[in-house]
Amino acid sequence: MTEMRTVLITGCSSGIGLAAAVKFASEGDMVIATMRDLDRAGALREGLAEAGVSADIRVLDVSDDVGTASGLEAVLADHGRIDVVISNAGIGIDGTTEELSVDDFRASFETNVLGAVRLIHGVMPVWRAHPGGRFIAVSSVSGAIGQPFNDAYCMSKFALEGLLESFAPVAAQFGVQVSLVEPGPVSGVFVDKSRGPQQQSSDGPYAEPRGRFQAVQDSAFDAAQTNDEIAQLLWDVAAADEPMLRYQTSELVEKMVGLKFKDMSGQRVLGMTSRWI
C-alpha cells in the first residue's frame, strides 16, 4: 500500500494517537485526526507543524452513538473514502473491583470496546461495497494479562480482543483486514486516564498492596517504549501486504502474551501477578 491513503485515527490529542497522526501524515497519508475535545488539539497542531505536515482535525467522541455516526458520515462526505481506521481512543480507570462503581466499568466499556464497535458500524458498509479497508485497534498487554488494580481497563481490553478476533474472519470475507496492536508500558502521560489510585483512600484495605503494585508499575515505566515507537508499528501494520491479527510491540510483551497462551490453568500468570502486590 504505497499510494496516499485516507487514514482516520481516534484519540489524537496526546500519546499514541498524536504520534500516529504525525507519523502517517509524514508518510504522505491524508490523516483525519480526531478527539473528543478540540480545545485539547494544541499539542497535535504543534507536532504537525514541527514535522511540516498537516491533518484534518475533527471532533469525534467514540462513546457517543449519534456523534460517531454523524462524524464518520461527514468524513466520508468530505474525503470520499476511509482506507484505514486506527481505533486508539481509550480511557484507563484504576482500582480494584470493590472500589469501582458500575459506572466506572460502564465508562471503560463504552469507550474502549463499544467505541470500536461504533467505528466498525460506520465504515463497514462502505468497505463491503469497496473492499480493501483496514481496521487497526490499539489494545494492550492488559488485553491478555489481567493486572491488579486495573480491573475495569483489563476487562475492556480483554473484550476488545475477543470482539476483533471474532470479527476478523468475517471481515476478511469482504477484503477487510483487522489487526490488534498490543503495547506494554508507554512513556508519557495517559491523559485520558480519568480516575486513578490518588482518588482511592490512602489508608483503606487495599492501600498496602496498591503501594506495592505502584512501585512495580513505576519500575516498568522506567523501561517504557515511546509513543513514536508505537506509531511506527501502527504504520508498518497499515502498510503490510498481509497483516497479522496480533502484534506485540516489544520482546517483553511477546513473552508475557506467550506465557498467557501457554498457561492453560492460569496458575503461572496468577503467580506472576500475585508477586506484583
Q: Which residues make up each language-model segment?
A:
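The beta1-alpha1 cofactor-binding region of Rossmann-like NAD(H)/NADP(H)-dependent oxidoreductases
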Residues: V59-S70, V102
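Active-site helix of classical SDR
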Residues: I120, S156
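Residue(s) in the substrate-gating loop at a strand-loop-helix junction
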Residues: S140
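Conserved glycine-rich cofactor-binding loop
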Residues: S13-G15
